[in-house]
A protein has these predicted regions:
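Structural recognition of the conserved hydrophobic beta-strand(s) that form the central parallel beta-sheet
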Residues: 484-486, 658-660, 684, 690-696, ...
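Conserved AAA+ ATPase "SRH/arginine-finger" region at the nucleotide-binding site
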Residues: 506-508, 716-725
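Extended, folded cores of ATP/NTP-driven motor/assembly subunits in large transport
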Residues: 1-405
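P-loop NTPase motor domains
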Residues: 46, 57-72, 266, 360, ...
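Walker A/P-loop NTP-binding active-site region of P-loop NTPases
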Residues: 458-515
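A short helix-turn-beta junction within AAA+ P-loop NTPase domains corresponding to the substrate/partner-engaging
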Residues: 501-502, 706-719
Length: 821
């Protein structure tokens, strides 16, 4: 590919001859050797995936307004705007849970997941906007005095500064950060601006000092060799190869999403790749713009071209220029695609296809290869394939679109829960809490409640178990973490037990192990039991009189004064009066309680000899409600006890707590439970807790009396695919935009994609655990694997260090058990 390399080496010109920069002349301003002024601002960009076209067009119109301002300032110096969109490879790996406070399964999975995420190309998209003031004319011959030169430069800097300030102001919604100078601990002055320009030359980020020599001699620590259509970069860190793509022709119309396809990896046979996209717009005066449009019209007429629609568009453009709605400018585009010697061609071909799909006519640079490379530098005037376009066209093409990245550190509980990938291969740092990305929120107690909605088969169970597994790192030497999960269909039993947790499946007719009267006889517990017993007896709909309430209170206090081993629900009637009349006896508290005790049909629920439910026994505790959720008699009383135990056993010391309710709307069917959950939803943050509720349908949530309150008190909403989604439920109930709803409804349930929304910002995420077959077998919690796991638990116990090797076949099982697997 580089047959001419020897000749190139022999006749090699110093790269410094092509670098336009001379010196840092003012904070954040570089002057070029020909007198041009350059300043650059980095912006975070703006989300666009679930944003309406109307909103994106309004953004483009604001950008168009600045370009008109820039054109009006070009009466003395010609102004250019150069926009860079950089895609580069990044690596990151989050921490693994504490070895002494988590199970081996958790640590092995999190470590392997973090490693895969880091090793497979993660991409960062960075946006830079540079303003260039091209010196219109050389100094007059009689202006040789240094004072006169300084005065002219001062005037130019003043005008340039005002326009640049307007640029930064126009970018305020994009979180602008002006690139300037900074000092290290030794007082050495470095420059972010020079680091950026040097990156454009070398393809590598490095700190650059403000030198005491001309900038063109200090920058560009790279050797560049050119082939027919490829450049080779050699730096101290290695080699890279680059191909450049230009545009020969453009679509008839532009719109804001036109070039966004370059950000997505649509070819799963190859990894995402780095590139530097450069777009330059040099504003023309109104007269020059009108002349340029008239020239294009004349050329069409001379060619006897039948492009009537093009003529009409040009006429419309002339009217808009004349009315001051747009300006015309010289536009150029280059896309430098990076790769290894083996991959650069495939990467460039992929970009060519994406540009073709967007309606462009792209071409790889050959004769203009070096020009395209140098065109990246703000301040370089030479460029190939210059086209006349409008300021609105440029606003559409250089649209400043980007993706939110979440918040990696300084969250209320520290590091992000998990690093997840977007379809663009960019990292997203997921958190339950929603806090200002720029603020240190460590130790704060903001809202962290999270809703997860998705149709059956969309991956809700896997996502829940993945997040809980990842969250185990929040249990460390300085902090306790308790996870309480109200399960459905035992979907999380394997995951909870693999995390070293406990699991209680409450099944109709089988002793639940719950005996609330064996709680400690504190005043708080006794008062709860009085109220709970009153509600339990009153579930038959008959009136509880003030005298009944007094009798219940006395009976509960009497039972709670006994030794723990004697305390149970069946003892309560001994302290309840039945009345003298037959009618009184038939409707007595004792009779109404009879179905809940001894041989009564519901005695299995609470009349247990020993209480085996202790939420502090395990750091992770799962409770399966599949059976009792369908049983209206016991659903409310059981849930009320469970929530009370969470309040008193787990959350009282304000430890970090995550409460999860799968198909939680069923728990809300009982009014008392709904009230408790509603109160907890509003106050849980003050106790350092998070409520996570999941459901297959928003309709189930919203039909609850307090459904809208649950929506309003969630910081994070995760929407998995739902092809049966109802627009009213999502847009009115959960306050999704129509564009967000459209995405949720259109996603394939097998895509492993989801939409995560925090505040006004939503982002598409893909959670693909296809390379983690073992973890998926546990996270998915299918009926077959759960049944097999339960057989293992009965044989070898619940210790994950023991049962997991059998579960995965690392240890041989008896033949009968092996067949079950």
């Amino acid at each position: 590919m580089f047959a001419q390399r020897k000749a190139l080496e022999n006749s090699e010109k110093s790269l410094s001859e092509f670098i336009p920069y001379s010196a840092v002349i003012a904070p954040g301003v570089v002057i070029c050797r020909e007198g041009d002024l350059v300043a650059t601002v980095k912006i975070s960009g703006k989300v666009f995936e679930a944003v309406s076209n109307d909103a994106l067009q309004r953004d483009a119109e604001r950008q168009n307004n600045f370009l008109k301002v820039m054109a009006s300032a070009s009466s003395t110096d010609e102004m250019s705007l150069k926009v860079h969109r950089i895609r580069r490879v990044v690596h990151d790996e989050l921490s693994v849970p504490d070895e002494n406070l988590s199970s081996r399964f958790v640590r092995d999975f999190v470590r392997a997941y973090n490693s895969e995420i880091s090793e497979n190309n993660l991409m960062a998209t960075e946006l830079y906007v540079s303003l260039v003031s091209h010196k219109a004319t050389a100094l007059k011959r009689d202006k040789y005095k240094e004072s006169e030169i300084r005065e002219e430069l001062k005037e130019r800097l003043e005008v340039f500064g005002k326009v640049f300030d307007q640029l930064v102001s126009s970018l305020r919604d994009y979180e602008p950060a002006v690139l300037g100078e900074y000092s290290d601990e030794q007082g050495i002055i470095f420059s972010h601006q020079l680091s950026f320009y040097n990156y454009l030359l070398t393809g590598q980020w490095q700190k650059v000092r403000v030198p005491f020599m001309p900038l063109n001699e200090a920058l560009g620590n790279v050797q560049v060799f050119g082939g027919a259509d490829t450049l080779e970069f050699q730096t101290a860190l290695g080699k890279s190869y680059v191909q450049s793509i230009e545009l020969k022709d453009y679509p008839m119309a532009t719109y804001s999403r036109l070039l966004d396809g370059l950000l997505y990896n649509t070819n799963f046979d190859q990894s995402s790749y780095p590139f530097i996209e450069t777009q330059t717009f040099t504003a023309l005066s109104k007269n020059k713009g009108l002349k340029a449009l008239k020239l294009q019209q004349n050329q069409l007429r001379s060619a006897q071209d039948d492009a009537v629609s093009q003529m009409q568009l040009l006429s419309l453009a002339r009217d808009m220029v004349a009315n001051g709605q747009i300006v015309i400018g010289d536009y150029s585009y280059s896309l430098l695609v990076f790769g290894s010697e083996d991959t650069v061609v495939a990467h460039a071909n992929d970009s060519v296809k994406k540009l073709q799909d967007a309606g462009f006519l792209p071409i790889k640079s050959t004769l203009a290869l070096v020009t395209s490379y140098l065109h990246q530098l703000p301040g370089r005037k030479d460029r190939s394939r210059v086209a006349k376009i409008s300021s609105m066209n440029f606003a559409h093409l250089a649209s400043f679109h980007n993706f939110p990245c979440g918040k990696r550190d300084r969250n209320p509980w520290g590091e992000a829960v998990a690093l997840m990938k977007m379809p663009s291969d960019q990292p997203y740092y997921f958190n339950f809490h929603y806090t200002d990305p720029e603020k240190d929120s460590l130790g704060d107690v903001p809202l962290g409640n999270t809703a997860i909605l998705g149709a059956s088969g969309a991956g809700k169970t896997v996502l829940l178990n993945f997040l809980l597994c990842s969250a185990q790192k929040y249990r460390d030497k300085d902090h306790q973490l308790s996870v309480i999960l109200f399960d459905k269909d035992k979907g999380a039993e394997l995951a909870i037990k693999a995390m070293g947790g406990g699991y209680l499946a409450i099944e109709n007719g089988k002793p639940s192990g719950i005996n609330p009267f064996q709680l400690e006889p504190t005043t708080e517990n006794i008062q709860f039991l009085i109220g709970w017993t009153k509600r339990l007896i009153g579930r038959d709909g008959l009136q509880i009189t003030p005298l009944d309430e007094q009798r219940i209170a006395t009976a509960v206090e009497t039972v709670m004064s006994m030794p723990a081993k004697y305390r149970r629900l069946a003892v309560l009637p001994q302290s309840l009066q039945t009345g003298d009349r037959v009618e009184d006896a038939q409707n007595s508290l004792t009779m109404r309680l009879s179905k809940w005790i001894e041989t009564g049909p519901l005695a299995w629920a609470f009349d247990n000899e020993i209480n085996t439910l202790d939420l502090n026994e395990f750091p992770n505790f799962g409770i399966d409600g599949t059976d009792f959720l369908e049983n209206e008699d016991v659903r409310g009383p059981i849930t009320e006890i469970l929530l009370y135990l969470i309040e008193t056993q787990v959350m009282k010391d304000k430890r970090r707590t995550i409460i999860v309710m799968d198909e939680f709307w069923k728990y809300l069917s009982d009014p008392a439970t709904a009230q408790f959950a509603f109160d907890k939803l509003k106050t849980i943050r003050k106790q350092n807790g998070i409520f996570v509720f999941a459901s297959q349908s928003p309709e189930d949530v919203l039909k609850s009396e307090r459904g809208s309150a649950f929506v309003d008190n969630t910081a994070t909403k995760i929407y998995l695919p739902n092809p049966y989604a109802n627009e009213k439920d999502y847009t009115e109930g959960f306050k999704c935009t129509k564009d967000e709803f459209s995405i949720i409804k259109s996603l394939d349930t097998q895509s492993r994609l989801m939409l995560i929304k925090q505040g006004p910002v939503s982002v598409m995420i893909r959670l693909d655990l296809g390379n983690f077959k073992r973890a998926l077998k546990i996270f998915s919690g299918t009926a077959g694997t759960t049944k097999f796991g339960e057989k293992l638990f009965s044989l070898v116990g619940d210790d994950p260090e023991v049962w997991i090797p059998y579960f995965f076949g690392d240890k041989p099982l008896p033949t009968s058990e092996k067949e079950e697997a």
